[in-house]
Amino acid sequence: MREKRLWNEDWLFCAEALPARAFSVKGPMYKQAKTERVRSGPAARMHNDAVDDYRDGAEYSPERWEAVSLPHDFVIEGVPEARGNNARGFFAYGDGWYRKHFTLPPSDAGRRITLYFEGVATWATVYLNGCLLKRNFCGYTPFEVDITDLVEFGADNVLAVHVETGESEGWWYDGGGIYRNVYLVKTDRVAVDLYGVYVAPQKAGEDLWRVPIEITLRNDGYAACEAEAQVSLVDEEGAIAAVASATGSLPARGKATLLCEAQVRAPRLWDVDAPHLYRAAVSVYVAGELRDQYETRFGFRTFYADPQKGLFLNGKRVKIKGVCAHADFGLSGKAVPDNILRWKIRRIREMGANGYRTSHYPHAEATMDALDEMGFIVMDETRWFESSEDGLEQLRTLVRRDRNRPSVLFWSTSNEEDLHVSPIGRNIHRAMAAEIRKLDDTRLITAAISVRPDRATLGGDLDAIGVNYNFPLWDPIHEKWPQTPVFISECCATGTTRGWYWPDSAEHAYLSAYDRDTNESFLGREKTWKAVMARPWLLGAYQWIAFEHRGEAVWPRLCSQSGAIDLFMQNKDAFYQNQSHWTSAPMVHILPHWNHAGREGETIAVWVYTNCEEVELWLNGRSLGKRQIERFGHGEWQVAYAPGELTAVGYAGGMERVRETVRTSGPAAALKLVAEDTRATANGQDIAVFTCLAVDAEGREVPDASATVTFFASPLGRIVGAGSDISQHKRLSDPVVRMRAGRAAVAIRLGREHGTLRVMARADGWQSAQCALEI
């Protein structure tokens, strides 16, 4: 029977190139030209993890190898420097080695044993007991390594992974290491293949759905056999909605695909507001004996894109209110545990988003699961725009992995390629699209085009045209390809700094928090969303970007400023601006804060983001006037600053619906710690996040406070990241933080011990804060 075990514990890591000895005589060269080709160095089975036993007898100190758990990013452990590459986050990149000792019981002999790597950045070479098994050249594509023939049962085995980060895969922070989960998988020699079940529901009548099912089985035995696959379609309550079965012949050391079909009446549909999911549970039998059990999730939904009327999901018109996102996390780098990946998706759902673009590569499986569960419309993007065999295999892996996900409506072959306007680009896209259709012909195939999208050679080959920015070309593109749906695959990229309400600062590389246009192609959030909603033929838009991310930066700033949520997971004003565009529950948000000592009497621009029809602004009990708010617009007042209370009241239908007040605080007197809802558990991987606020003597937040804050954590966890100021240059795990704009955050990686996690924050002259979290 199938066993899948998370394999993230008990790894050793060394941040060194550690080359093997270059032999110059026949004997050792003869040996290393055999299957066990590596007889020296860290890939060798007998290499001492603490002693360098192959370089002229010299010894390494034991500290060079450290015990680590996955996910792990060794690049983030450095300190950013101005001489570093600004696109890659100003960090020094290098090579690293991982080793893991393990023993499998003799009872596993006869089974198929594989390792499943969700992601290794960037190039990975995998060895078992000195034998080369796999080279992988994409840090974002998962891969499987079959160790069946080489593993020794009942004995110590050594897995070694060499990671090279010199080859950048993008213009953002790549990180380095085994930064996603690894699994040890054991199956019978007859079992479902990797991503081997494909479920493609089709509506056949008013309430009737046909459910074609493909089951790809593999036979790693040395004799052909007959196999039967029995499938149960199971709803969220565990009730069986339908069953089906198929039989077929499996060749020795080969694969076969079995086909069957079920029928389901009146299933609960997957939708952006009610994302119901089903399971396909597959049992595999040979000669009546159960050999494997495998499950995959799927959903029932219909969609079509009308080039004149927009996107329809389950017969209802829906606009994509989307965001793009990179896969890193400001408080841990590229190594992001599953609970944080899910938390990030919950945060953008709170913002009102219903769409997610996996820019510009496959995202982690926990992210994709959360998108299914929370009802997002996903544009699923591969990393490399290549029709080479390696490029196509990466694409096939993405499609096989995600083709059962109801959230995925688009396959994206590429992003911002110069070749999009070349015949070569069309050739590559058509080859990639053909591969996609072999595996899944139920989604729209697209590309995100920024280089003269009105002249794209592949425009007529796309199921839907994705346009990045280029606002003046939206209408001409629609006119040129009137039979092809169009959507905005990337827009805005408006840089703002949390809590910075002054002109842009070259010294700190801070940007004003007020929304604005960059130029006529790069519109701000307000103008972009107005333009999207004014065009019913647009399917919607994916905004750049949900979260600030490392890289694409200007020193001394360490990150891009386009996010609606800052690098350390604090909401920016843009978060609430998006809420005003994308949500219906009445809301108002005032900017700026109301702490402006020394500016008494000066005129300050006060903006209010709201989804209400009218807003009235009050200062210290005096009305400053009521404004009618243009849909997707904002209210704006020029206010002479006076300390006190500034209140915005939102009205709809002539009735007050919501209000918000910002107050002038006193000087900061204390710190306050708040545990974020990351739903962390004591599993050795999860991260708990705490926000630290500066408050005055009355407990009011001080939004302009600054101080040096030091964090402490109990033995139940260790600090992996702390930050506030995007222009502070320190090791991320350093617990000493320069608080900016009254807030900082700390991330604690939990161990396996249950109990009370205690976190403390201290700043000279202020009352300390403590927070306890049961884990």
Task: Give the ranges of each region predicted by the language model.
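Active-site-adjacent substrate/metal-binding segments within catalytic domains
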Residues: 52-57, 64, 69-104, 108-137, ...
